Design a protein with these regions (language model features):
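N-terminal active-site segment of His-dependent metallophosphoesterases
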Residues: 1-63
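Extended active-site neighborhood of metal-dependent phosphoesterases/phosphodiesterases
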Residues: 58-161
């Protein structure tokens, strides 16, 4: 294997940034990384998005998820399957919802909801093993461990929904 290039980012806050700042906070860096804007591009084999794809103080919904998927697909030189995701605290659900349904459906690290996420597990350059909240993949002699924020009980007291 030649040089492996890993790009890591987090806290895109996709829907809230689009709503408040009219900024595509996930699509813009993807375009920049591919050199399709004023910024110079750079080589990457894998993009790790380390959580908080949503920036809302409330649980994300279908509209937010569809926007995330749209912005991931801004990539022209890379496949969605080259992008690996973790859930952050803003990506969480409430106690009365299926645990992390939004993350599992739209960010879909295991490729179980391809019809919503566009992630085809057979197309992963480095196949994943594990579960949506803790999984791993291997690149050469490096094992990458991905551990999400579960947030099963809903927002902590400091972010109690009003």
């Amino acid at each position: 294997m030649e040089q492996f290039n890993l790009w890591a980012g987090s806290c895109s806050h996709v829907h809230t940034d689009l709503e408040r700042l009219d900024r595509e906070s996930l699509a813009d860096p993807i375009r920049q990384s591919e050199g399709r804007t004023d910024a110079p591009g750079f080589d990457w084999d894998v993009f790790l998005h380390l959580g908080d794809t949503s920036g809302s103080q409330r649980p994300p919904n279908e509209e937010h998820g569809e926007e995330v998927v749209r912005q991931f697909h801004a990539a022209e030189d890379h496949r969605r399957e080259q992008m690996y995701n973790l859930a952050g605290n803003h990506d969480g659900t409430t106690p009365d919802q299926e645990t992390q349904w939004w993350f599992k459906r739209y960010l879909d690290p295991m490729g179980e909801h391809t019809e919503h996420s566009g992630v085809d597990p057979a197309e992963r350059p480095y196949p994943v093993e594990g579960t949506w909240e803790r999984y791993a993949f291997e690149v050469g002699n490096v094992r990458v461990l991905m551990l999400s924020d579960r947030n099963d009980g809903g927002p902590p007291d400091g972010r109690r929904m009003v």
